[in-house]
């Protein structure tokens, strides 16, 4: 039986893990890396995902897509989307109010939704797991930031469907990290644990009580738009200004230069976690100008001061909401690559009167680790370590409906344990009102205009009655994924109307998901065809060059005419290879057959003259075999 996996779908990096042999295995990708960049690139001939995509980003900035998690489930006019677009070299367009990414692939313009890009990263993680487990992987638990709203969760689930995965559960990243921390600490009594999760693009804080395998989230807070990418942006802006000062030139208009600078900034940021100063050296960055500079840790901290400080607000909010004071928090666990920044560690430590945070779990892998444990539990693949484990998570935002005067009336308050169901009775606002419009919002503000509209629907056919008489029962039902279903019923007629919140037309329809799934299959077939073509080309190239080597090493042993015929053919093939950039697999194969037709008789004759072919002739030459003549056994002399 092939197992269900846990996938941490990150803004900048993703990670996949599986529960096997009574423990979690983090699965390395084909490059041997335990995390994979959440990058997808398109070029004239192929699609690249992961390390291969990130490695070529400077050469192909407009068609390399990353940060899809900062777009997923959002509206095009969101302030964050508009701000991010200034930093991205790829083109984001407005498609029916939602952001979509426009790239050039195989010479034509293509538009992808953030769900499709995320699904490509998920496919890469799925293939990584399949290579390791040796079978098809179809079930997964996928993680999201705890502060993701309903539409972002739903869109992530859709991305899983497009990738051909049955998403067993969407779980919150800090909760998954808490499992990684607490799995082996069952017998230690009740503990209050604060998870501080600062990744590449999102930030969450959750406070949990862990006792005997029960992980109960008391409160959660965060910012779905704060992470390492924002620190990189500050560095990039700083150096763009410095370059302008020194050279009177603005490199921000050049996507390739900006990308090379960003890569250097990301590297510098990492170095500054362990060194007090680092240098940046980029040859010919812009207009042929070399850019050599340095930056200290203190300067970096100053550039990001407000962002670093802002991470403390959610910590205070979680302590307030959970009514647990600082001194009662037993452990502070740091998760996410950005928690390696010394200033962040110091701020957290100072917040808890100088206590050192717990560093017992790997900040890059903890989330996938916890997701893998949850995947094992949901598929019944339990063992002693996981059998009594219970997760009780919460809804991150209040959810409710709009009542007269644009007031937000919450039915489910934030930090309510999910799954949960709440009902309330409402009535009509005017006499003989034939129907009501139920508008569903999420958020903490008093007026709905300041909250996020999740969806709306009509309940019609209410019998005429004075205002306030009809009784309309509205029920909110939040499932274990944190996704909301709403039902409204007129108690007198029993008429009801319900929706699964589909984010104000924002959600992909079943048909769209099926179309994207079919497209994903098509892309996969194209990727495989491209790989087969490369293989055919490489095979022909190595065959040609090994023939060439044999010809030049044994010039005197060949028949002169044969030598000339074959040399001419080999040179002809080698020069055609240089011009056959976009040839098909079949073209390479027919060229190989053509070359073999000339080479085989000549090489057979050559080896015959030598007394047998050397073990394995060039390029896997057919008819290879015998040992070289001089080694045909000991020579015997006749003795008188």
Swiss-Prot record:
Pfam families: HSP70. Residues 609-626 have a biased composition (Gly residues). GO terms for cellular component: cytoplasm; cytosol; nucleus; plasma membrane. Disruption phenotype: Abolishes LAC1 expression and activity during glucose starvation. Abolishes laccase activity during calcium stress and iron stress. Severely decreases laccase activity during copper stress. Melanin absent from cell. Decreases virulence in a mouse intravenous inoculation model of infection. CDD domains: ASKHA_NBD_HSP70_HSPA1 (cd10233). Its main location: nucleus. Transcriptional coregulator that functions together with transcription factor HSF1. Positively regulates the expression of laccase LAC1 during glucose starvation. Interacts with transcription factor HSF1 on chromatin. Belongs to the heat shock protein 70 family. This is Transcriptional coregulator SSA1.
């Amino acid at each position: 039986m092939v197992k269900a996996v846990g996938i941490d779908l990150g803004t900048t990096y993703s990670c996949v893990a599986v529960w096997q042999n009574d423990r979690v295995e983090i699965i390395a990708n084909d490059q041997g890396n335990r995390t994979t960049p959440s990058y997808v690139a398109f070029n004239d001939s192929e699609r690249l995902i992961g390390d291969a995509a990130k490695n070529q980003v400077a050469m192909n900035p407009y068609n390399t897509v990353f940060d899809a998690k900062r777009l997923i489930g959002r509206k095009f006019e969101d302030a964050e989307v508009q701000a991010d677009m200034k930093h991205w070299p790829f083109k984001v367009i407005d498609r029916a109010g939602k952001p979509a990414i426009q790239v050039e692939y195989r010479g034509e313009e293509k538009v992808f939704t953030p769900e499709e890009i995320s699904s490509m990263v998920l496919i890469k993680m799925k293939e990584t797991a399949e290579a390791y487990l040796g079978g098809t992987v179809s079930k997964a638990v996928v993680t999201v930031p705890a502060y993701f709203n309903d539409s972002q969760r739903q869109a992530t689930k859709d991305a899983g469907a497009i990738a051909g995965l049955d998403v067993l559960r969407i779980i919150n990243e800090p909760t998954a990290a808490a499992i990684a921390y607490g799995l082996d600490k069952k017998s230690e009594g009740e503990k209050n644990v604060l998870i501080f999760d600062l990744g590449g693009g999102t930030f969450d804080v959750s406070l949990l009580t862990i006792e005997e395998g029960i992980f109960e989230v008391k409160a959660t807070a965060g910012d779905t738009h704060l992470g390492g990418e924002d620190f990189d942006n500050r560095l990039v802006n700083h150096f763009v200004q410095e370059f302008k000062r020194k050279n009177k030139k603005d490199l921000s208009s050049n996507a390739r230069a900006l990308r090379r600078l960003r890569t250097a900034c990301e590297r510098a940021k990492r170095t500054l976690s362990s060194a007090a100063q680092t240098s940046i050296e980029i040859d010919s960055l812009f207009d042929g100008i070399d850019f050599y500079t340095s930056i200290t840790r203190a300067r970096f901290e100053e550039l990001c001061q407000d962002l670093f400080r802002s991470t403390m607000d959610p910590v205070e909010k979680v302590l307030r909401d959970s009514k647990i004071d600082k001194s009662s928090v037993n452990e502070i666990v740091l998760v996410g690559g950005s928690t390696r920044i010394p200033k962040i560690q110091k701020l957290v430590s100072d917040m808890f009167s100088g206590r050192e945070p717990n560093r017992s779990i790997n900040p890059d892998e903890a989330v996938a680790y916890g997701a893998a444990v949850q995947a094992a539990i949901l598929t019944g693949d339990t063992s002693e370590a996981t059998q009594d484990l219970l997760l009780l998570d919460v809804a991150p935002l209040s959810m409710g409906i709009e009542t007269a005067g644009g007031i937000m009336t919450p039915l489910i308050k934030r930090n309510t344990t999910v799954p949960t169901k709440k009902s309330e009775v409402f009535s009509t606002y005017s006499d003989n009102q034939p129907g009501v419009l139920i508008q569903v919002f999420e958020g903490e503000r008093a007026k709905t205009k300041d909250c996020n509209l999740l969806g709306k629907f009509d309940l019609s056919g209410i019998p005429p009655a004075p205002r306030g008489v009809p009784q309309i029962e509205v029920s909110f039902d939040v499932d274990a994924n944190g996704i909301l279903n709403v039902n409204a019923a007129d108690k007198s007629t029993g008429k009801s109307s319900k929706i699964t919140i589909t984010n104000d037309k924002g959600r992909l329809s079943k048909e769209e998901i099926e179309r994207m799934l079919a497209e994903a299959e098509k892309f996969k077939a194209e990727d495989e065809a491209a790989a087969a073509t490369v293989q055919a080309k490489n095979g022909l190239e190595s065959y040609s060059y090994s023939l060439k080597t044999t010809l030049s090493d044994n010039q005197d042993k060949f028949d002169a005419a044969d030598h000339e015929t074959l040399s001419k053919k080999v040179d002809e093939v080698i020069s055609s290879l240089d011009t056959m950039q976009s040839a098909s697999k079949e073209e390479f194969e027919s060229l190989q057959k053509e070359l073999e037709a000339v080479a085989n008789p000549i090489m057979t004759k050559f080896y015959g003259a030598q007394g047998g072919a050397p073990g394995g002739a060039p390029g896997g030459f057919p008819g290879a075999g015998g040992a070289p003549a001089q080694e045909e056994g000991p020579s015997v002399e006749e003795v008188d």
